[in-house]
């Protein structure tokens, strides 16, 4: 039997041998968020070896710990750096996971409360949607206004041509 994606982040109070209410509800909310299933397991994050990102790490950890307050106050966050591979997407994933873990007991599972949008995929989906129906673009369009938390991942990773940008 595969290990539950919540195993390291669960007190096992909402399950028995045959079912887990929390896993079912969190799984449904994660699916609605469009976060790929391979990212449902909470990953550990550490600071750089030299500690250069310690203050940013502490700030993001504090936001994660107080994610309900952060979202309810309508705060925004833009994670950026000069390079890749330094944890921006990992932190964005952790924040989506934290929010869903915060709201799952009260959520009625009829609204998409968080969205994880891979920006280049979304832009391509919008282009594709001109010639034929694109389910990814339509889903985001239909749920963007109701989501309390929206992550635009890799927003600056791929620059389009001048033609693409001006369309």
Label the model's feature ranges.
Residues 47, 118, 153:
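Conserved RecA-like P-loop NTPase ATPase core
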Residues 124-167:
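Conserved nucleotide-sensing/catalytic segment adjacent to the nucleotide-binding pocket
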Residues 70-71, 106-109, 142-145:
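Conserved catalytic network of the ASCE P-loop NTPase/AAA+ motor domain
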Residues 70-93:
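Walker A/P-loop nucleotide-binding motif
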Residues 111, 116-126:
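A short hydrophobic beta-strand->loop->alpha-helix junction that borders the nucleotide-binding pocket
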Residues 1-69:
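A short, basic N-terminal segment
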Residues 97-114:
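Post-Walker A helix-loop "phosphate-sensing" segment adjacent to the P-loop in P-loop NTPases
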Residues 74-78, 113-114, 149:
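Residue-level preference for the first positions of well-ordered beta-strands
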């Amino acid at each position: 039997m595969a290990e539950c994606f919540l195993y390291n982040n669960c007190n096992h109070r909402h399950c028995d041998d045959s079912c887990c209410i929390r896993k079912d509800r969190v799984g449904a909310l994660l699916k609605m968020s469009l976060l790929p299933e391979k990212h449902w397991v909470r990953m550990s994050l550490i600071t750089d070896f030299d500690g250069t990102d310690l203050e940013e790490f502490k700030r993001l950890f504090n936001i994660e710990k107080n994610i309900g307050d952060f979202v309810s106050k309508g705060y925004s966050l833009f994670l950026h750096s000069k390079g890749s591979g330094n944890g921006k997407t990992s932190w964005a994933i952790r924040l989506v996971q934290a929010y869903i873990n915060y709201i799952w007991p009260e959520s009625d599972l009829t609204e998409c409360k968080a969205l994880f949008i891979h920006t280049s995929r979304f832009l391509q989906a919008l282009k594709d949607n001109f010639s034929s129906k694109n389910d990814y673009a339509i889903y985001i369009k239909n749920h963007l206004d109701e989501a309390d938390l929206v992550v635009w991942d890799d927003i600056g990773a791929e620059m389009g041509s001048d033609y693409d940008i001006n369309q």
